Amino acid sequence: MEQTTLLRLAGAGLTALAGALALGPVVIPLMRRLRAGQTIRAEMSARHQAKAGTPTMGGVIFIIPAILATLIFAPRSGDALPRLIIALVLTVGHGLVGFADDYIKVVLKRSLGLRARDKLLAQVGLAAVLGYGAVEVLGLGTAVTLPVLNLTLELGRPLYYLLVLIMVWGTASAVNFADGLDGLLGGLSVITFSFYGLVVALALGQTDMAVLGTALVGGVLGFLHYNRHPARIFMGDVGSFALGGALAALAVLTKTEFLLVIVGAVYVIEVISVILQVLSFRLTGRRIFKMAPLHHHFELLGWSEGQVLRLFWGAGLLFTLLGWLVLPGMLAGR
C-alpha cells in the first residue's frame, strides 16, 4: 500500500471517529429535547421495555463526520470523482429517506412513518442513479460474476437495472432489520465496511471507495461509544438506511454484486427470518420463530444481549472471511 493511500485511509477513519465522538454529546440532548424517543413493541421482552424513550435518529452522529471525512480525504482524479458522487448520493439519499421516516414516527408521533409507496419511489430513484452511473457513466458494463463458481453472466441493461433496484431496496431493508439490539448493527457494519473498504476497494485500486468505507468504519466506531449496551441513543432509520445505501453502492461500484450475499449473509438471514415468519403465519396461523427478526428470537429464548451480539458478530466475521477467500477467484476471472 502506498504511503499516500495509507495517509488518506488513516485520516478519513480518524477524522470520522473524532467527529462522531464529538457529535454524541450534542445530538443526544437535542433528540431528548425533540422527544425523539424510541417506541418499543408490546411483545418485546421486559429488558427491551426498559429502553422505551431512548433517543433515536442517532445515525447523524456517524453519517455527517463520515461524509465530511470522505470529501476531505478521497481522491477525485479520473473515475474517482463520478464514482464518489454516486456512492455519496446513495448514502446521503438513503439517510434522508430514513431521517424522514424517523421524524414522522418519533417527532410527529405518526406511528406508520413515511408511506411505503413514497419510500419505494425514493429508492427507485436512487437505484436509477446507481445503475445509470455504473453502466453509462463509469462504463462498468452489465455483466455479473457469481462467487465460488466464478462464472460471468451478461445480463443486459434491463435485467441489470432490475438487479440494482433489488439490491438497493433489499440491502437497505435487510440492514434495517438487523438494527434491533444495542451495538448489533454497528458491529456488523464495522466488519462489512472494513472488508469492502480495506480489501475489495483496495484490491481494485479504488482508493476513493476505500476512503468511504474506512470513514464509515471510523464514524460507526465513534457512534458505538454511545450505542453500546446500555445504549444512550439508537441510530434509527436515518443510520440503518444510510448504511444500507452505502453498502449497495460499494457492491455495485466494485462489481461484486453477488459477493454481498456472502459477506452480508447475516443481513440476508435476518430478512429471510421476517419473510418466513410472515408467510408461515398467513398460511398456517403459526409462527416459526418466537419473534422476528431472528435476533429477537434468541432474546426470547432467554439469551442475554451480549450472547446474541457475540453470535451475530461472530457469524458476520466468518461470512466476511468466506467472502475474502472467494474474492481472488472472482477478480481473476475478470
From Swiss-Prot:
<dbReference type="InterPro" id="IPR000715">
    <property type="entry name" value="Glycosyl_transferase_4"/>
</dbReference>
<protein>
    <recommendedName>
        <fullName>Phospho-N-acetylmuramoyl-pentapeptide-transferase</fullName>
        <ecNumber>2.7.8.13</ecNumber>
    </recommendedName>
</protein>
<comment type="similarity">
    <text>Belongs to the glycosyltransferase 4 family. MraY subfamily.</text>
</comment>
<comment type="function">
    <text>Catalyzes the initial step of the lipid cycle reactions in the biosynthesis of the cell wall peptidoglycan: transfers peptidoglycan precursor phospho-MurNAc-pentapeptide from UDP-MurNAc-pentapeptide onto the lipid carrier undecaprenyl phosphate, yielding undecaprenyl-pyrophosphoryl-MurNAc-pentapeptide, known as lipid I.</text>
</comment>
<feature type="transmembrane region" description="Helical">
    <location>
        <begin position="184"/>
        <end position="204"/>
    </location>
</feature>
<feature type="transmembrane region" description="Helical">
    <location>
        <begin position="205"/>
        <end position="225"/>
    </location>
</feature>
<dbReference type="GO" id="GO:0009252">
    <property type="term" value="P:peptidoglycan biosynthetic process"/>
</dbReference>
<keyword id="KW-0808">Transferase</keyword>
<feature type="transmembrane region" description="Helical">
    <location>
        <begin position="84"/>
        <end position="104"/>
    </location>
</feature>
<keyword id="KW-0573">Peptidoglycan synthesis</keyword>
<keyword id="KW-0812">Transmembrane</keyword>
<feature type="transmembrane region" description="Helical">
    <location>
        <begin position="158"/>
        <end position="178"/>
    </location>
</feature>
<dbReference type="GO" id="GO:0008360">
    <property type="term" value="P:regulation of cell shape"/>
</dbReference>
<dbReference type="InterPro" id="IPR018480">
    <property type="entry name" value="PNAcMuramoyl-5peptid_Trfase_CS"/>
</dbReference>
<comment type="pathway">
    <text>Cell wall biogenesis; peptidoglycan biosynthesis.</text>
</comment>
<dbReference type="GO" id="GO:0051992">
    <property type="term" value="F:UDP-N-acetylmuramoyl-L-alanyl-D-glutamyl-meso-2,6-diaminopimelyl-D-alanyl-D-alanine:undecaprenyl-phosphate transferase activity"/>
</dbReference>
<keyword id="KW-0131">Cell cycle</keyword>
<feature type="transmembrane region" description="Helical">
    <location>
        <begin position="11"/>
        <end position="31"/>
    </location>
</feature>
<keyword id="KW-0961">Cell wall biogenesis/degradation</keyword>
<dbReference type="GO" id="GO:0005886">
    <property type="term" value="C:plasma membrane"/>
</dbReference>
<feature type="transmembrane region" description="Helical">
    <location>
        <begin position="258"/>
        <end position="278"/>
    </location>
</feature>
<keyword id="KW-0460">Magnesium</keyword>
<dbReference type="GO" id="GO:0051301">
    <property type="term" value="P:cell division"/>
</dbReference>
<dbReference type="InterPro" id="IPR003524">
    <property type="entry name" value="PNAcMuramoyl-5peptid_Trfase"/>
</dbReference>
<dbReference type="Pfam" id="PF00953">
    <property type="entry name" value="Glycos_transf_4"/>
</dbReference>
<keyword id="KW-0132">Cell division</keyword>
<keyword id="KW-0472">Membrane</keyword>
<feature type="transmembrane region" description="Helical">
    <location>
        <begin position="55"/>
        <end position="75"/>
    </location>
</feature>
<dbReference type="GO" id="GO:0008963">
    <property type="term" value="F:phospho-N-acetylmuramoyl-pentapeptide-transferase activity"/>
</dbReference>
<keyword id="KW-0479">Metal-binding</keyword>
<dbReference type="Pfam" id="PF10555">
    <property type="entry name" value="MraY_sig1"/>
</dbReference>
<feature type="transmembrane region" description="Helical">
    <location>
        <begin position="311"/>
        <end position="331"/>
    </location>
</feature>
<feature type="transmembrane region" description="Helical">
    <location>
        <begin position="124"/>
        <end position="144"/>
    </location>
</feature>
<dbReference type="GO" id="GO:0046872">
    <property type="term" value="F:metal ion binding"/>
</dbReference>
<keyword id="KW-0133">Cell shape</keyword>
<dbReference type="GO" id="GO:0071555">
    <property type="term" value="P:cell wall organization"/>
</dbReference>
<keyword id="KW-1003">Cell membrane</keyword>
<keyword id="KW-1133">Transmembrane helix</keyword>
<feature type="transmembrane region" description="Helical">
    <location>
        <begin position="233"/>
        <end position="253"/>
    </location>
</feature>
